[in-house]
Amino acid sequence: MWKQILSKLPKKSSSKNHSSSSSSTSKSSDNGASKSGNSQTQNAPPVKPSADSGFKEGNLKGNGNGFTPYEALPGFKDVPNAEKQNLFVRKLSLCCVVFDFSDPTKNVKEKDIKRQTLLELVDYVASPNGKFSETVIQEVVRMVSVNIFRTLNPQPRENKVIDALDLEEEEPSMDPTWPHLQLVYEILLRLIASPETDTKLAKKYIDQSFVSRLLDLFDSEDPRERDCLKTVLHRIYGKFMVHRPFIRKSINNIFYRFVFETEKHNGIAEFLEILGSIINGFALPLKDEHKVFLVRALVPLHKPKSLQMYHQQLSYCITQFVEKDCKLADTVIRGLLKSWPVTNSSKEVMFLNELEEVLEATQPPEFQRCMVPLFRQVARCLNSLHFQVAERALFLWNNDHIENLIMQNRKVILPIIFPALERNTQKHWNQAVHSLTLNVQKIFNDIDAELFKDCLAKFREDESKEAEIGAKREATWKRLEEIGNQKQKSSL
């Protein structure tokens, strides 16, 4: 009975049989690969490499002992025209293998083969023979995706955010895979820009998911990659109109996250550079959506401590809006005043630079709406102990348009800033600030001597009152001190 039960159990295969089976499978695989040659590379399913092979992903055929050699395919000039497109697709598949660049001594030959193949692909895309087929577009996007979409591993940046000056001085982090990445980006760029690319076909593969992943790469620490991404995204925005609202909204969300959550992102300057071109192309009158973007996304970008890294591009975008619609000047200036730095003098100089650019495009009605709070802030800048801040504020009078705006409204503005000007002439430590202040006073005195005289009299009257109040305050404290001393003595 036991024998009958045991005989029904499945027998465990011996290690010898297993080895024999594995060997025969390997031979079969080798034979199949040798028969099919390179033509099977295109259709072969990807096989994941071993951990130490140096390959991340690819289409190399397994043979039981490792992989078929990573070998160069024939050149385009060596095949008939009818075969060139098939060869192009095969070369794209070959370039889907991603190498490990952390060790420069590993896979040197294979890396060079891939680089040469990528160069051939760049030339082929740049000089196509007719429209690109859907298969070609699909394979190009697949190859690009395999190579560029990866997890970014940023270096710790806690200290970088604290001081933008340190961030600017540090050497940028360079991606070791750039010799391949650069060519991959070039292929993508040429595909998008090519007149032989059918937009209707391409948008199936360059879709919102692709664009979203592309936007994520802007946080790369390599400035060369961000520069390529900037060009690629700009081309996509220009060619694929269907993606325009999505791109604007996505950048908007990245700005929100940067301003209100992380204050960490490497690609803000590049995004703003793209937006500067986009804003320049906005049709008039501006849509409400675009005005909301200005108020909720661009103006708050003045708050982060790393403003210096992207201020030039931000200032250009802001100025573009005001030039397109001068009624936005009041909104922009009040936004600047709301974010005005209190303890960061270098940032304050940047704000004054931007303020001049905005005022350059501001018309009298908008200027009059915001001139009171604006020149209260300018007065504080005039009295700044940091000579560059005071000097930059005084330079506003060197701009003819701004000087005209001020002089048209001098009866409101001069009483606000006169105390600051007078204190500079009396107390400021810097000789350049002292001289510039005298020049500004002379401008007002030459245009409206009576107003200047009234403001001077008012200033002296206020100074006298302040001195009296100060003397009374001092006498009161002295009296309180005497009373306290008397009580202390009496208690003893």
From Swiss-Prot:
Residues 1-63 are annotated as: Disordered. One of its GO terms (cellular component) is peroxisome. Residues 16-39 have a biased composition (Low complexity). GO terms for molecular function: protein phosphatase regulator activity. The keyword RNA-binding does not apply. The keyword Phosphoprotein does not apply. Induction: Induced by epibrassinolide. It comes from the Eukaryota. Disruption phenotype: Reduced plant size and fresh weight. Keywords: Brassinosteroid signaling pathway, Cytoplasm, Peroxisome. GO terms for biological process: brassinosteroid mediated signaling pathway; negative regulation of brassinosteroid mediated signaling pathway; positive regulation of fatty acid beta-oxidation. InterPro entries: ARM-like, ARM-type_fold, PP2A_B56. SUPFAM superfamilies: ARM repeat (SSF48371). Highly expressed in dry seeds. Expressed in roots, cotyledons, rosette leaves and flowers. PP2A consists of a common heteromeric enzyme, composed of a catalytic subunit (subunits C), a constant regulatory subunit (subunit A), and a variety of regulatory subunits such as subunits B (the R2/B/PR55/B55, R3/B''/PR72/PR130/PR59 and R5/B'/B56 families). Interacts with BZR1. Interacts with PP2A2, PP2A5 and PP2AA2. This is Serine/threonine protein phosphatase 2A 57 kDa regulatory subunit B' theta isoform. It comes from Arabidopsis thaliana (Mouse-ear cress). The gene is B'THETA.
